[in-house]
Amino acid sequence: MDPNLQYWQNNGQSFLSRLGLWSKILDPTLLLSQAEIEEARTLIQNEENTPGKNDKVSNAWLLSLSSVHSDTGAVISPAYRPQVFLPISAPLVVGSLIAHKGIKSAMFWQFVLHTYCAGFNHANRNATATKDNKTTMKQSLLILGAVSYSTVTGALPQIILQRLRLISSLTQTICRSFLPVPLAAGLAAFNILVVRSEEAENGISLFDANGNAVGVSKEAGFKAVKETAISRATLFGTTAALPTFLMALLERAKFVQRNPRLIAPIGSMCTVITFGLMIPVSFSLFPQLGKIKKENLEKEFQSLDGNEELFYHRGL
């Protein structure tokens, strides 16, 4: 078991402990060079020889958790590390949720957002589901299909408004305020389910309480993908819903009615703030090192001696 997973096993089994950890891991200042990351990994691997826990060791753990893949031990591409998820994706989320004058611009923002999310989901997947941890041609085609489908479906409210110009005000309100919420949540979950589908099809590695690999399980793979899909749907669904609700209240305020141009920038600020606050919350909903009871696994695992639960890397 990778040192990162061992750390999560000892420190991330409650929601509050995970939330505290993610709040530190998501610090953009942790975006450091590969040499510094490798130095941090060497330090934590020799932690037993370090006299006590000091700030240097603590920072090394945060750097490892935020920059090194827990299955391969390889350094994650800088664009897909957790600490840059907010700076990169926040503008894309705002662009995907605001009203556009044309269909092309709406589809452009949807395409860029879902392309980045697909890359992030793939880079932070459980990499034990594929041989030599490499991306298969089938998976590449699935990712392309997921991005294409999400681009069109995400722009559906704008397509309806543009193509059906003579529609009631109620329909316009539904398309602009209500429809984007389930679409954002559903497409975020859909992206995870498709991009990481091979984990459920091929299975992922299981570990016992001592960190020893005991086999590969499709049931654990399905559970890992399902939990991450719920996490991502919570993130994007809340980000779409809460600012809409807040803006509906603010639009009644006199100062906003006197200055209608404030609505757009205030709405964008609400979206960014909500998204930023929800990232550590959504990442913390489920443990990075998940547990699954042997009775819920394949028969080959139910006869294993020892603990009643086994562990798996959930991915992000």
UniProtKB/Swiss-Prot annotation:
Subcellular location per the Swiss-Prot or TrEMBL entry: Mitochondrion inner membrane
Membrane topology, as annotated: Multi-pass membrane protein
Major subcellular site: mitochondrion
GO biological process, one term: mitochondrial transmembrane transport
Signal peptide: none
Transmembrane regions listed in the UniProt entry: 83-103, 141-161, 174-194, 230-250, 263-283
Keyword Nucleus: no
UniProt entry keywords in alphabetical sequence: Amino-acid transport, Membrane, Mitochondrion, Mitochondrion inner membrane, Transmembrane, Transmembrane helix, Transport
UniProt-recorded Gene Ontology molecular function terms: monoatomic ion transmembrane transporter activity; transmembrane transporter activity
This protein's GO CC annotations: mitochondrial inner membrane; mitochondrion
Highest taxon, organism lineage: Eukaryota
Knocked-out gene: effects: Morpholino knockdown of the protein causes erythroid abnormality and global defects in respiratory-chain activity. Morphant embryos exhibit erythrocytes with enlarged nuclei containing open chromatin, consistent with maturation arrest. The nuclear/cytoplasmic ratio is increased nearly 3-fold. Anemia cannot be rescued neither by exogenous folate or vitamin B12 supplementation, nor by N-acetylcysteine treatment.
Function according to Swiss-Prot or TrEMBL: Mitochondrial amino-acid transporter. Does not act as a serine transporter: not able to mediate transport of serine into mitochondria.
Family note: Belongs to the sideroflexin family.
Protein name, per record: Sideroflexin-4
